[in-house]
């Protein structure tokens, strides 16, 4: 690597809204505040919810279904 062209790395703290604190190396230089992390993200915790959009589709077809028929 060429000397003098790379940004300096510093250890920062990334704090999640769930209270999880992660120490990482970064070039940002200041602490980060996260909305979600691996400890509270629904995909990783297994608390995913299936969103049923059937009601929305029926509502759309009810409002605009007659426009397509001639």
Swiss-Prot record:
Pfam families: Ribosomal_L31 (PF01197)
Function: Binds the 23S rRNA.
Binding site for Zn(2+): 16, 18, 37, 40
One function term, GO molecular function aspect: structural constituent of ribosome
Bound cofactor: record note: Binds 1 zinc ion per subunit.
Name of the protein this chain belongs to: Large ribosomal subunit protein bL31
Required cofactor names: Zn(2+)
Domain of life assignment: Bacteria
Record keywords: Metal-binding, Ribonucleoprotein, Ribosomal protein, RNA-binding, rRNA-binding, Zinc
Protein family per UniProt: Belongs to the bacterial ribosomal protein bL31 family. Type A subfamily.
Provenance organism: Shewanella amazonensis (strain ATCC BAA-1098 / SB2B)
Record Gene3D superfamilies: Ribosomal protein L31 (4.10.830.30)
GO biological process: translation
Record-linked SUPFAM superfamilies: L28p-like (SSF143800)
InterPro entries named in the record: Ribosomal_bL28/bL31-like_sf, Ribosomal_bL31, Ribosomal_bL31_A, Ribosomal_bL31_sf
Gene Ontology CC annotations of this record: ribonucleoprotein complex; ribosome
Assembly behavior: Part of the 50S ribosomal subunit.
PROSITE patterns found in the cross-reference section: RIBOSOMAL_L31
């Amino acid at each position: 690597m060429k000397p003098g062209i790379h940004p300096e790395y510093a250890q920062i703290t990334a704090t999640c809204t769930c209270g999880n604190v992660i120490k990482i190396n970064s070039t940002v230089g200041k602490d980060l505040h996260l909305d979600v992390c691996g400890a509270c993200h629904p995909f990783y915790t297994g608390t995913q919810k299936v969103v049923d959009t059937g009601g929305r589709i029926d509502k759309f077809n009810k409002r605009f279904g007659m426009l397509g028929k001639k």
